[in-house]
């Protein structure tokens, strides 16, 4: 049976019925807070159950608890703060206080109604140190943190409409994947998180997981990324080619997850597992340096952190780095291959980008030709 939502209940906070009628009659007089795309995406993820059991942006008690203990104030595992920032000037000018309804807008488009419960300040340096394990502004997550407002607003929200989504036809929300898995008769599902196009190492890991479960959820992230990352549509196109040509029919669900990437390493690995639990996954594939960037985290820190959460409710699958062994004649890892480094060919993401950027097909021991062609055919595959 697919996993229960985190906290036991799948959140759904979409404005409807009488509440929507009231909103439509009063919204012109309500205070408005213009938010960037990242917060608009957070709002929709909150409302559609991606971040269950959260029903809105964190109040201070939950925020501080997550920062210090990696658990909500009710002791439920949670590792990444989901917070809404604002400038102090906006708070003073609008005169908002607890109990007020605030419209969150993106490019003027009403996205959600926030019922304000808490207004509090935060220490961005401490936040960076706890979440990212560094205060270095060169870390993309730290840099983004320092650019945010100096006040945080907490409270439950109701979605009016999500921000425009160019990948909507590829997007399934938790309530939809759960129905789909049930229709397929899947009792166990492994989820694979990615922000890259697939090479043979990814395929090796996914198929290893498929050996033990009924189905695979390939769940590429669409949202804020850093320069040099693959474009969302390129990742989808590449995975469609891989699944069509190299997977049995009916064992893989490909769905885009529109969620922000924090590059928070170990903490984010647990966060990604919790999110996939809400989608119904029973297992989550955790790779080497999961959600890492640069050299900020050790290669297997993302494995070690799971020991702190025996009550997580989803099984992590720790997969070793795959490489091509000339002696074995295929993709292997260090646990099953006895041969030395002179036989090992590691797949370099940087080298793949360089080759694909020049319009070259990588060697077939690195990437399937159909996948390479899907990427090369795009006029501008990188952000």
From Swiss-Prot:
The keyword Cell membrane does not apply. Belongs to the sulfate adenylyltransferase family. Its EC number is 2.7.7.4. CDD domains: ATPS. NCBIfam families: PRK04149.1, sopT. One of its GO terms (molecular function) is sulfate adenylyltransferase (ATP) activity. The lineage of its organism: Archaea, Thermoproteota, Thermoprotei, Desulfurococcales, Desulfurococcaceae. One of its GO terms (biological process) is sulfate assimilation. Pathway: Sulfur metabolism; hydrogen sulfide biosynthesis; sulfite from sulfate: step 1/3. It catalyses: sulfate + ATP + H(+) = adenosine 5'-phosphosulfate + diphosphate. Keywords: ATP-binding, Nucleotide-binding, Nucleotidyltransferase, Transferase. This is Sulfate adenylyltransferase. It is an enzyme of class 2 (transferase). InterPro entries: ATP-Sase_PUA-like_dom, PUA-like_sf, Rossmann-like_a/b/a_fold, SO4_adenylyltransferase_pro, Sulfurylase_cat_dom, Sulphate_adenylyltransferase. The keyword Nucleotidyltransferase applies. Pfam families: ATP-sulfurylase (PF01747), PUA_2 (PF14306).
